[in-house]
């Protein structure tokens, strides 16, 4: 996605206009404009010149972001913070300008209000020269109003320019309202002068009360107040993104030929050697060559506990070296660093639009023309009803200035920006606004077992010694054997032995028998290690040890037997243990009304043991890597599905799911395929992400309700609909004040999300979700591998429906499933045999 900065936008109608203009450019596949950040994201093959021209022709300005940074990268020098240049773009320049305009306007407005209303309402004294000099009073009011209009000329330039381009915006409404009040007041001044010349005092008094100079000036000043408050609040919504950008180090200390040199971060290249002293920020992503330290990674992950780093470990830019001296090699620089990628994700998400925003966009596109029409009709109706021009004009002006398309346009993006920032602070990255909105609607969460529910690193859980054997002896011999093994479980045994500081000795004639075990010799004794099947051929295993082994296996652990000659030394159990927060995370998901399913390639016994520990609702075992995609397709029939995984083999399933969630410590492929990335690799962040999504969506609904409600109530009141019934009428000045506050209220409400605690489960509510198909409905779903076309579907359907118990079979080669409706009970084995007789493989039957 290419990012552009757009200038000249003032409301939702502007962003809609720009979006439509760019979307029509040949080669543009998608375009999303953010009024909040004055940015535009464009995808496609269209050239930069064509895109900028389309924006310019629409009456606005545009320039591509980061073009300098891109050039630097091309030349080989790369800025670790090329993305960080956007920090300047996010700087709040609008508030100081508006503040200056407001103060200048107030100086003239206060004087204007003194002359126009002070002496009439509160009896304030006037200079003797102005006493009963109505023409001079009118001229002073006109001149003071002109001063305020000149100060706020931006409304008129932008408003009438947009009207000229047939794309009226909020500035158009303000400009028309203020200009109408000024023009009519000027007419009244000349009419009053004419009456004065002809000695018509009744006419003089009549036209004097038709002055709306103070309304014209007050409208501009109050709208400026609202714009300033809105700009200040909007600036706060990007605090999280600006905070990330500020983390980027500005310099690095490089080492070359033993000489240390401090250079700017833009000069650091991949492969450079740099050093980091205690208390310093790590400048770029790298690999530790020398030294050890505790590194605070809270800036990236939100995890406050420092992580120990030593030679061979990876470090990331913007993390803090807390204790030791580190010498590192730069592995990722510029836009490739983890920090840059996080910033890019958050920035891209802000540049995309949530589906719910489309409603407001459609309304905003016709809102301003509709308001202008309503204002014109209001004036005509009141004139036809016999009211004066001044009265009718006041009602029309009130309609123009009370209407607020900005509140509609800001309702969604401000909440998305704040929600996204809150996620980034907590190590939860939403790639798009769509993922932030849709995550809260999830009904089923499918969890990969390894690395998601479990740590992904096997550990020794039990050490059971045979009679007459000490634990030290068992561990020492096991260590000697496993030291030369490349089996994944060997690492767990080695780590346990090293932690126990066991005796270390070397073995000879080491042999690894794939699928069976290990053998070696030590001081004329033969050492063996492996599974029960292998060891039982070498020595007798007592009933007690067999029962212990069975018990361990039932708990999802892998029992490893070790012998010395024909004597059994004992059993060491190894398991991929579940993460500490997994059971609580699963419980929280269930409390939110979400069904939790665990997917794994492990055998059913091991899978069910892990599933029971985690507390999941359903376990689907023996799923081959390419079978997860089919399982997700089946689950999607029961509701919206989120897939959580970390491996390469999870990527297809992450893409297939409604929402893909990647555990941050996983592979780049899984992260690329996901919609949400969890930086902390903590399962408890899954309910946190869903919780944040729901809170953001709730905030958007509140904002949209306020924006629609405000206009539905405000416009009829301004038009004078209630005057015949209750006598309620709205002065244009109060209409302008209401308009000013409406956008401010929407932005302020969105800022409340900053107070939201993503890990607080106390207020979780269950969603209404589709219920899982129960067994009593006599349906079973087969996940089938090998079907390629409609012919395959027909063969499987015919084979299944040939069974007397099967009423109907619905087969899909795309989903890789067959759903059978049964007349009576039938075994899973019978269904499996019927399909596999046609040369297809049944992965699972549910």
Task: Pin down the residues of each PLM region.
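Flexible metal-binding regulatory segments at protein termini and peripheral loops
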Residues: 1-136, 161, 259-260, 344-352, ...
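Conserved cytosolic catalytic loops of P-type ATPases
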Residues: 26-43, 48, 210-211, 242-336, ...
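Juxtamembrane coupling segments of multi-pass membrane pumps/enzymes
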Residues: 75, 195-196, 201-202, 217-278, ...
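Conserved catalytic phosphorylation-site environment of P-type ATPases
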Residues: 300, 359, 394, 407-481, ...
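P-type ATPase nucleotide-binding
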Residues: 460, 464-592, 604, 616-632
């Amino acid at each position: 996605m290419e990012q552009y900065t757009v200038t000249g936008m003032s409301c939702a109608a502007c962003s809609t206009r720009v979006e439509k203009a760019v979307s029509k450019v040949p080669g543009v596949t998608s375009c999303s404009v953010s009024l909040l950040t004055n940015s535009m994201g464009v995808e496609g093959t269209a050239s930069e010149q064509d895109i900028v021209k389309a924006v310019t022709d629409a009456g606005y300005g545009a320039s591509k972001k980061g073009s300098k940074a891109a050039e630097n990268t091309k030349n080989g020098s790369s800025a670790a913070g090329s993305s960080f240049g956007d920090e300047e773009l996010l700087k709040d320049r609008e508030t100081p300008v508006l503040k200056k305009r407001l103060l200048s306007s107030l100086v003239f407005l206060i004087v204007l209000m003194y002359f126009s209303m002070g002496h009439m309402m509160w009896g304030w004294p006037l200079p003797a020269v102005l006493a009963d000099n109505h023409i001079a009073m009118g001229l002073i009011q006109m001149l003071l109003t002109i001063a305020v209009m000149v100060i706020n000329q931006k409304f008129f330039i932008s408003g009438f320019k947009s009207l000229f381009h047939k794309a009226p915006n909020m500035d158009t409404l303000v400009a028309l309202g203020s200009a109408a009040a000024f023009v009519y007041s000027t007419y009244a001044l000349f009419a009053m002068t004419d009456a004065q010349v002809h000695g018509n005092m009744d006419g003089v008094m009549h036209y004097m009360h038709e002055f709306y100079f103070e309304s014209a000036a007050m409208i501009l000043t109050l709208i400026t107040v609202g714009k300033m408050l809105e700009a200040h609040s909007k600036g706060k919504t990007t605090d999280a993104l600006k905070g990330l950008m500020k983390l980027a180090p500005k310099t690095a200390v490089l080492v070359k030929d033993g000489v240390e040199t401090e250079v700017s971060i833009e000069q650091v290249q991949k492969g450079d050697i740099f050093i980091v002293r205690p208390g310093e920020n790590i400048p770029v992503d790298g690999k530790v060559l020398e030294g050890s330290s505790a590194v605070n990674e809270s800036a990236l992950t939100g995890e406050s506990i420092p992580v120990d780093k030593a030679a061979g470990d990876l470090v990331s830019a913007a993390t803090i070296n807390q204790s030791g001296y580190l010498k590192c090699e730069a592995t990722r620089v510029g836009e490739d660093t983890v920090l840059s990628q996080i910033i890019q994700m958050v920035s891209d998400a802000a540049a995309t639009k949530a589906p719910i925003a489309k409603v407001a966009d459609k309304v905003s596109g016709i809102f301003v023309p509709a308001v202008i029409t309503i204002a014109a009709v209001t004036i005509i109706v009141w004139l036809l009803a016999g009211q004066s021009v001044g009265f009718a004009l006041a009602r029309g002006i009130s309609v123009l200035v009370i209407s607020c398309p900005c509140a509609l346009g800001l309702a969604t993006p401000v909440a998305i920006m704040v929600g996204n920032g809150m996620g980034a602070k907590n190590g939860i990255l939403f790639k798009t606004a769509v993922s932030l909105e849709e995550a809260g609607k999830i009904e089923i969460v499918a969890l990969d077992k390894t690395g998601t529910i479990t740590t992904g690193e096997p550990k020794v859980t039990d050490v059971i010694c045979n009679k007459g054997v000490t634990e030290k002896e068992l561990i020492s011999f096991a260590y000697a054997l496993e030291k030369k093994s490349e089996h994944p479980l060997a690492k767990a045994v080695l780590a346990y032995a090293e932690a126990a500081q066991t005796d270390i000795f070397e073995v000879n004639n080491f042999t690894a028998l794939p699928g069976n075990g290990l053998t070696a010799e030590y001081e004329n004794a033969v050492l063996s290690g492996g599974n029960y099947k292998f060891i039982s051929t070498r020595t007798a295993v007592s009933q007690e040890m067999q029962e212990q082994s069975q018990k361990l296996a039932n708990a999802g652990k892998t029992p490893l037997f070790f012998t010395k000659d024909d004597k059994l030394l004992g059993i060491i159990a190894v398991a991929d243990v579940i993460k500490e927060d997994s059971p609580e995370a699963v419980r929280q998901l269930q409390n939110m009304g979400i069904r939790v399913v665990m997917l794994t390639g492990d055998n059913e016994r091991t899978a069910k043991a892990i599933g029971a520990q985690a507390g999941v609702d359903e376990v689907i075992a023996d799923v081959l890597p390419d079978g997860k995609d089919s399982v997700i397709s089946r689950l999607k029939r029961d509701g919206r599905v989120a897939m959580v995984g970390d491996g390469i083999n999870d990527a297809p399933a992450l893409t297939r799911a409604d929402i893909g969630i990647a555990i941050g410590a996983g592979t780049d492929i899984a992260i690329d395929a996901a919609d949400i990335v969890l930086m902390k690799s903590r399962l408890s962040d899954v309910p946190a992400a869903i919780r944040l999504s729901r809170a953001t969506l709730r905030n958007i609904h509140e904002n949209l309700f306020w924006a629609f409600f405000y206009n539905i109530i405000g416009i009829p009141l301004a038009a004078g609909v209630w005057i015949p019934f209750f006598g309620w009428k709205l002065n244009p000045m109060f209409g302008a004040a209401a308009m000013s506050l409406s956008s401010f209220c929407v932005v302020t409400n969105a800022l409340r999300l900053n107070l939201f605690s993503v890990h607080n489960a106390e207020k979780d509510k269950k969603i209404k979700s589709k219920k899982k198909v129960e067994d009593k409905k006599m349906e079973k779903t087969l996940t089938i591998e090998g079907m390629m076309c409609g012919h395959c579907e027909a063969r499987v359907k015919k084979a299944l429906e040939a069974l007397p118990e099967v009423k109907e079979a619905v087969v899909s080669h795309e989903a890789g499933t067959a759903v059978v409706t049964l007349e009576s009970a039938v075994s899973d084995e019978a269904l499996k045999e019927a399909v596999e007789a046609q040369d297809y493989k049944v992965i699972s039957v549910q």
